Amino acid sequence: MLWVGLACHFIGFDTLFMQSWRIREPVMWLTEYLTGNRKTYGMNKVGGVARDLPSDYKERILPVVEKIETETLAAVDAILGDSSLQSRLAGTGIITPEDARAFCVLGPTARGSGVDIDARRDHPFAAYDEVEFEVCVEQGCDIWARTLVRIRETIEAIKILRQLLDKMPGGPVMAEFDEIPPYKVGVSSVEAPRGEVHHYAMTGP
């Protein structure tokens, strides 16, 4: 909803911009409840997470998910039903599949040009190999197609969240490991909101 709201603001659709922020706000409350912060969560640590989730996390999350899903679908209908919005975005900002590959375009921008790539599926990390989700690809190659990808991914994220809540395991939140030897290398690739993010790390002496 952050992206949807900002996109609407940039093109002058401020009514939906404000509605998107309203829909998003309960998510911010939830993240503050679960992590202690609205934005910079500080939960990830080497070997696990900083603290366990509260015991009632499912009871707190599910009603918010239900509400957000309903309101998001209504916002999507408003976007898809706005002919002036479509006329401004369709046919604008063309990136052909060939250009997308030539310029190494990634993420939703690539998928809006018909390039079927997604690190969550192609190089599974975290628990993505344990959930079902659709890689959202559009063939329009324009801003409208990229907008549709973002919209579809917002709905898909809600479906993923439901699965993760059902499959959340118990147990310790930090892995136990001995002293890590020096000069060991780790490489990761994850699907971020704007495309793949790669990290390279090496242990010190």
Language-model regions: role of each:
Residues 1-205:
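Active-site bordering "gate/hinge" segments
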